[in-house]
Amino acid sequence: MVKKAYYRSFQAVFNVGARCLVWRRPIPVSGPGSICQIPGILKKEKVTKAMVVTGPNVGKKLAPKILAELDRAGISYITFMEVESNPSVNTVNRIQKLYLDNACDGFIAIGGGSPMDAAKAAAARVVRPNTEVGKMAGLLKVGKKLPPFLAVPTTAGTGSETTIAAVITDSETHHKYALMDLHLVPKYAILDPEMTRELPKKVTSTTGMDALTHAVEAYLCWTYNTNESIRLAEEAVCEIFRYLEPAYRDGDDMEARTQMLIAAYKAGFAFTRAGVGNVHAIAHTLGGLYNTPHGLANAVILPIVLEDYGEAVYEKLAHLAELTGVKYSGTDAEKAKAFIDEIRAMNRRMEIPTGFDFIQEKDIPQMVEWALAEANPVYPVPVVYDKKRCEAVIRRIIDEA
């Protein structure tokens, strides 16, 4: 009880301070072919040599389209195409060194959350060269304006193109932590559905559920919410319920692809402003220990945690059930449960598992420790977990596999 009172007091004070900050959204450039506008943006920002950051798959398939645009415009660039899933401190430091050694003056991050997070953290190290990545973990520890930064999402889900966060994994301990600073918000978000056309179905599904988790958790984090973040979270949930499965079934459905990018953008800003919760805190432990893709972890954990919250979230989930057309009548409890059931049904239709059987017994105490340390006191979660309850949720994730 004492800890819970402290957490709520911390959140109340933080909320007062947060409302005094300027919460900038990236400038969106959207629509099919919008990557063609990148050279003009770079020239406007006076970037003469760009640091292009991505992963190996995107580097082979999608990055060449952007590099061709830079070549045609006569803009120099250096590439780093080795970002792994759940990027490490070592990767961040390699990008920073490459940037400085080649006198780059701007970033283009192409891909899902991993390349964007790695590039953000590297950009933070560029402006804070004497500060190790781990020393910038937590809130508002970057404190300096980044070089011009363009984010080009190739998945509709992570929201990294809009957020203040960069999630990095310690190379030695495998602990996953977040840098959170307003300066980490990219200046531009290039939302080109052509960049998501060839996504594997399993990536479309899990990153889409990642976006849904962002929107739902932000919506439930009432303390930090504003009218804008509430509206964007509601819109994102509705758009994901409508467009995710069509995008999953048909990668060439450009309307669905476009709307999913916009939904992910909205959800990204909503959780940037309002926060996330216990779903993310537990999911990050799976990424750190087992390299579980973040969207997959969120997709599996979301309905389990929502059920565990129980009546603390019935009213809000009932409203989402009405907005999405899942259920209009009945009690709040009935509508909330119908909403959770529909999330499970979406997972099932997109062949997402119901749990994880790879979690090892010996790792559960570490998972509990990391999850509670991430969530508290910063996240204004609907239900504050203690060790016993967090462990029980993790065991449900195992049992439901």
Model-derived regions, located:
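ATP/NTP phosphate-donor binding region
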Residues: V2-G106
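C-terminal charged capping/lid subdomain of soluble metabolic enzymes
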Residues: V2-S9, L317, K327-A401
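Glycine/threonine-rich beta-strand-loop-alpha-helix active-site module
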Residues: N90-L191
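Short, hydrophobic/aliphatic alpha-helical segments
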Residues: R94-C104, E194, D252-L286, V368, ...
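Carboxylate- and glycine-rich phosphate/diphosphate-binding segment that chelates Mg2+/Mn2+
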Residues: A165-A274
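Flexible, glycine/charged-enriched surface loops at secondary-structure junctions
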Residues: T223-L232, A247-Q259, A274-V279, G330-A336, ...
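C-terminal catalytic subdomain
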Residues: A274-A338, R344
